[in-house]
């Protein structure tokens, strides 16, 4: 078991991301944004510079937090851009010695019901992307987010059935604000524990996020791990009980909300919040481990 995180929430530049990781005493980063671009979209010179700085610092990238087929990509859009992102990511993952890459299953078509989401085209595209990575010895992991698989655990299982070799990264916080489309409308929010229970046999990686849903504002209020409704402590304990030895990747959303560029804090506050989040979560894991020894 190891700790990692979306260090771009500590700071945009790779130097800051490395500094936060080293302050936590960790050896890994889940690489997403460097500057204003995803790691698979950096120009060659910028990527070379990132590789050199990581190497000098002794920090490794355990996963590419790619934008491939994510919530910003429509299934009705041409597939070419997703294929191009995958082709750019593969050689960069190999250079960094990174085996995991986070992908999704395209945005939910909000004007259509759950049973009319162009499933077959989604399965075709995600299946092709999965094979592209597997053929190169790399492992794609699907995140339950604002995408087809994130509509509920039944949709995730259907996706896995139709895309052989695809595995899961389970995000503890996303169900808190996601409609549960396995149930009839008006859709309630999902239960992280319920979702996790149904898909845990396929989980090889975990994103740690937490929060509470505010019906009055229609927004999620992000919290430190274990302080919200994401069932973080319960899920972590169950994973450890089952012998989980993969990564826990923190995605605080407290000092920087990646999906909303209007939410900003001062640079040092972002940095300190990320480090504090990591320290608190490490203590939570230690407490979960001790509870299993009692």
Residue ranges and their predicted role:
Residues 1-7, 29-31, 61-66, 101-103, ...:
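Hydrophobic faces of well-ordered beta-strands that scaffold small-molecule active sites
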Residues 64, 128-229, 286, 292:
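Acidic/histidine-rich catalytic cores of soluble enzymes
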Residues 13-19, 55-56, 72-170, 177, ...:
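Active-site acidic/histidine proton-transfer and metal-coordination neighborhood
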Residues 255-294:
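Aromatic-rich peripheral "rim/lid" segments of glycoside hydrolase catalytic domains that contact
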Residues 30-55, 106-111:
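Glycine-rich, proline-tolerant flexible connector loops at the mouths of alpha/beta enzymes
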Residues 9-11, 33-35, 67-70, 105-110, ...:
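Active-site-proximal loop/turn and secondary-structure-junction residues that shape catalytic pockets
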Residues 18-24, 41-63, 87-97, 127-135, ...:
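Acidic (Asp/Glu)-rich catalytic clusters
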Residues 42-49, 79-87, 115-127, 153-154, ...:
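Charged helix-capping and loop-helix junction motifs
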């Amino acid at each position: 078991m190891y700790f990692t995180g979306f260090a771009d929430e500590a700071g945009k530049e790779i130097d800051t991301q490395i500094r936060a990781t080293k302050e936590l005493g960790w050896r890994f980063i889940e690489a997403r944004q460097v500057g204003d671009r995803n790691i698979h979209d950096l120009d060659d010179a910028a990527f070379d510079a990132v590789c050199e700085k990581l190497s000098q610092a002794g920090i490794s990238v355990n996963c590419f937090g790619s934008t491939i087929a994510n919530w910003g990509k429509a299934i009705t859009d041409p597939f070419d851009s997703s294929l191009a992102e995958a082709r750019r990511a593969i050689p960069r993952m190999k250079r960094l010695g990174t085996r995991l890459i986070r992908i999704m299953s395209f945005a939910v078509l909000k004007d259509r019901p759950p049973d009319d989401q162009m499933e077959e085209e989604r399965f075709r595209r995600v299946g092709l992307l999965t094979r592209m990575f597997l053929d190169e010895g790399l492992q794609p992991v699907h995140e339950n987010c604002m995408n087809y698989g994130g509509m509920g655990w039944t949709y995730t299982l259907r996706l896995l059935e139709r895309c052989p070799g695809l595995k899961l990264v389970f995000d503890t916080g996303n169900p808190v604000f996601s409609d549960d489309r396995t149930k009839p409308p008006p859709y309630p929010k999902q239960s992280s524990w319920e979702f996790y229970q149904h898909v845990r046999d396929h989980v090889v990686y975990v994103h740690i996020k937490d929060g509470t849903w505010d019906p009055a504002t229609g927004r999620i209020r992000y919290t430190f791990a274990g302080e919200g409704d994401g069932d973080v402590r319960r899920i972590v304990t169950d994973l450890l009980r089952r012998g989980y030895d993969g990564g826990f990747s923190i995605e605080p959303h407290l000092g920087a909300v990646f999906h909303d560029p209007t939410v900003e804090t001062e640079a040092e506050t972002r940095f300190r919040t990320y480090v504090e989040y990591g320290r608190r979560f490490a203590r939570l894991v230690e407490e979960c481990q001790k509870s299993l020894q009692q």
